[in-house]
Amino acid sequence: MNDNLRSFIVDKLKSVDRPGIDALIEFLDSSDYFTAPASTKYHGAYEGGLAEHSVNVLDCMLTLDETFNKVYGMPKDDEGSIILVALLHDLCKTNTYHTKELWRKDKNGKWESYIGYVREPELCMGHGSKSVYLANKYINLSDTEAQAILYHMGAYDVSDYMTHNELGEAYSKNSLAYKLHAADMMATYVLENENILWEEINTEG
């Protein structure tokens, strides 16, 4: 476990004035939130990837909130709400991924064993909906917070409620929702993209 990352997340959650925060933190500690991967083989597919991804989403979301305000004059969302939805949007991934011996072909085409992650959730309840369910067991999410977490997958979610114009309706009325989705995409495909050589980009100028 990355103790510095845990301390950062706990401090951020405790900064939100919401009954049940301490109980929520106890749940995070009792689960594998701080050690779980963010996926089995894509972004954050390593120990601690889930917590790291959640912090990256928070950073991107705060940046979007500030930028939209300064550049477009849009009102800022409540910072406490941003902290909650960013750090809890993938709560559904706790107690879901487990290590197992897997097989793959090496560069010579020969089979080799390795230890990788497999998805074996203790509770099957969808993605965003499960995150909302778990969070609401400890704190009371507002309607906008719950909606933001529920729809954070955007068009990647194939659930029925996404196919009846509700996704666009939610984004058009709830800035917290589209900022969370955009921040999730930024964190996944930019900050956590191993194909982007940031050192080369940062030294070109």
In which residue ranges do the predicted regions lie?
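Acidic/His-rich, divalent-metal-binding segments that scaffold phosphate/diphosphate chemistry
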Residues: 1-106, 111
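Divalent metal-dependent catalytic cores for phosphoryl transfer on phosphate-bearing substrates
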Residues: 74-199
